[in-house]
Amino acid sequence: MRKNLWTFQFGGEASGLVGSAMVSQHFVVLLMSLYCLTQSVVESSSWWSLGMNPVQMPEVYIIGAQPLCSQLSGLSQGQKKLCQLYQDHMQFIGDGAKTGIKECQYQFRHRRWNCSTVDNTSVFGRVMQIGSRETAFTYAISAAGVVNAVSRACREGELSTCGCSRAARPKDLPRDWLWGGCGDNLDYGYRFAKEFVDAREREKIHQKGSYESSRIMMNLHNNEAGRRAVSTLADVACKCHGVSGSCSLKTCWLQLADFRKVGDHLKEKYDSAGAMKLNTRGKLVQVNNKFNSPTMNDLVYIDPSPDYCVHNESTGSLGTQGRLCNKTSEGMDGCELMCCGRGYDQFKTVQTERCHCKFHWCCYVKCKKCTEVVDQFACK
């Protein structure tokens, strides 16, 4: 019956066999295309999505919590296993991702690429499939966010496997100052972030010397740079004790820096990021040997940045059409650079602000609301 069907469609037994082979070939191609598409979706999904859809707790951890980890989008197999072992950590990984995303958007708010998110589990879209310096920054700031969130959660007693910092007393701390209190557990936060964030890269298997292997090395390097930024900027904080605030005695502990400082630090590293390439041994080396080799504290990239001026679905660029710009600025936020020479439209908006604020005894400030019509400019 099947033979007759093909004969009917292709006009004869011989042509039927050829037709069957052709259809089979097309079917295989279709399956391969679907497989590649599925793999692309899997590869593009990321644990960053935990920052977009916060993990609910505590009820999800009560009984049979393993399904939770399989339901969380963007996790690799290794990350799902860590989720099953450390389920109470997942909320703070999400917090760290969210902190990293927000800081990325703040640091690039005046740039053509402004760290915009998209409505899927890749979070940043196809632009992250390019090994650019923007991708390097994103990996670093998100890894830093996890260190920050987990270290702080330890200090606040939110996690069952860690507590206050046990960091050694700094050698330069004055003798009469006490080393104690409850510091941020940077050591634990660093180690857990390394285990979790790097898991996705370490479980990938690609041929040595391939582009994919260079991306893995790039991602791991920038993850480490992000973690080290948090570690480098952490400092000693102290509290005074004594009669009438005389500060005759101080208690000190290790404290994380404000995350804005981490963002500023990594933004500087972004501006000076090193362009890399694969050598014959399958290692990343500098493209230009005239510069100092990047350290583990620096960011590295392997691809030039795409054109962020125009919308391009293949690269993930959203373009700058409709972006607000500063008419009087000569910087990246200025209309000339932001709009890529396309010009801009002017429009008026009404802004409401607090004004004429007065302090009243005791103890509050009362303000009026003032409205103002202002000119704004948006790229064509």
Curated annotation (Swiss-Prot):
Q: Which InterPro entries match?
A: Wnt, Wnt_C, Wnt_CS
The keyword Signal belongs to this UniProt entry's keyword annotation: yes
**Which GO CC annotations does the UniProt entry carry?**
extracellular region; extracellular space; protein-containing complex
Task: State the post-translational modifications.
Answer: Palmitoleoylation is required for efficient binding to frizzled receptors. Depalmitoleoylation leads to Wnt signaling pathway inhibition.
According to the record, glycans are attached at 114, 120, 312, 326
Keywords on record: Developmental protein, Disulfide bond, Extracellular matrix, Glycoprotein, Lipoprotein, Secreted, Signal, Wnt signaling pathway
What Gene Ontology molecular function terms does this protein carry? cytokine activity; frizzled binding; Wnt-protein binding
Main localization of the protein?
A: secreted
> Does the keyword Secreted feature in the UniProt annotation?
yes
Tissue spec: Found primarily in ectoderm with lower levels of expression in mesoderm. Detected in the head and tail with lower expression in the middle of the embryo. No expression was found in the notochord.
Localization per record: Secreted, Extracellular space, Extracellular matrix; Secreted
The residue range of the signal peptide is 1-40
Function comment: Ligand for members of the frizzled family of seven transmembrane receptors. Can activate or inhibit canonical Wnt signaling, depending on receptor context. Plays a role in normal embryonic development.
State the name under which the record lists this protein. Protein Wnt-5a
Organism per entry? Xenopus laevis (African clawed frog)
